[in-house]
Amino acid sequence: MTARLALVITALFFASCTSESTPPPNGAPAPGQEVASSLSRDTAPDTTADELARLTADNAAFGWELYRELVKDRENLFFSPHSISVALAMTWAGARGNTETEMADALRFSLGQARLHPAFNALDLELASRAEAGGANPPLPFRLNVTNALFGQRDFTFLDPFLDTLAIHYGAGLRLMDFVNEAEQSRVAINSWVADQTEDRIEELIAQGIIDAATRLVLVNAIYFTASWAEPFDEANTRSDPFTLPDGTEINTPTMHGNAAMRYVDAENYEAAEVPYDGQQLAMLLIVPDEGQFAAVESALAASTLAQILDELSVHQVDLSLPKFSFRSLVPAKEPLRSLGMVDAFGGAADLSGMNGTGGLFIQDVVHQGFIAVDEKGTEAAAATAVIVGETSAPPAATLTVDRPFMFAIIDRPTGATLFIGRVVDPSN
């Protein structure tokens, strides 16, 4: 089976508190030109193992708190707390005063400015190395690409220290746009860049009307992930099986069937299994509440409970039945972030003076979009046995039939980074 695609885009829009603007000066760089810091990305950041562990723990805490805000009035959901954290960390580099404090509290940043950005750089570089760990001939080449970019008003001055921080720790350059006179053309150009980064899976991230003449900066983070399972599902075994919705309605949905060694637990009110991807570095954690327990299990999910679930898992030989699913989530993140305490950044009280030296900037909006597709396309993946190294006897058998709503997370095993979080209430939607 191939977990074909998981990709997420986060975009933030920054506006001036005044819509007044002067025409671009003679000799100003042309729209579309990239103005980069003179400094190169640091490929060997000075980060300790403890700092990296704190960062991934903080991001997980933020991710599950944001999850609780996002699932309100939703069925299926897919988003990347990592993508949102990276985009807002780049923003935080320019935040000062109470805006800086509120953002750190909402995002659960426990590292200060001097240590957070090198830690994000170290994590990004660590994730970039994952493609080297795949099998010899997977049905789908492993890809985990994280890309950052800034699009700024061509006649607006951004401070060199701000641009240096983003270049050194995030590899992000500044592409110049003319939001004042060409807002719609700028929107189309940014959407085109996003489409290029996501193999055309996300073509319309920014809707009409979001960018206007007051926009001064658009900051974008993209994550593109595609991989094969370590153990394949046989397409011939896929069949239409029943799946029970929260209201008790039973539908039939294409369901894959396979048997493989994986870490599994049958807990008090849920079952969980960690299904590894090719190379064994990343895995999808399935959390399947018992019948009637979905709300209780979901409401208890947090970084600490996720760690507890992972700690409880042990290797079993699992008969796994998993629905195929594919959906897109458009996540307006502004109000959920407000609910988490990030208030000043979105209005006149914002202090983003670290970006331009004078302030007068605020975040117009935060747009986040994710797409995931899981199916059994492709040929058989290279079998891996890393999960059973050290076992001296056959692991116990277990059966996990995912025939009811479930949550999932895609986790980088060596660092513990939670890259994606989602839930499937209706796999046919």
PLM regions: where:
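Detector for small/aliphatic-rich hydrophobic stretches
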Residues: 2, 9-180, 413, 424
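Non-catalytic, conformational "gating/processing" segments within enzyme and secreted inhibitor domains
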Residues: 30, 74, 112-291, 311-396
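Proline-rich low-complexity regions
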Residues: 81, 108, 289-291, 323, ...
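Extracytoplasmic/secreted cell-surface and envelope-processing proteins
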Residues: 99-104, 293-297, 329-332, 382, ...
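Short Gly/aromatic-enriched secondary-structure transition segments
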Residues: 101-107, 233-242, 295-304
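Extended hydrophobic
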Residues: 219, 271-287, 395-429
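C-terminal, non-catalytic macromolecule-binding modules
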Residues: 303-306, 337
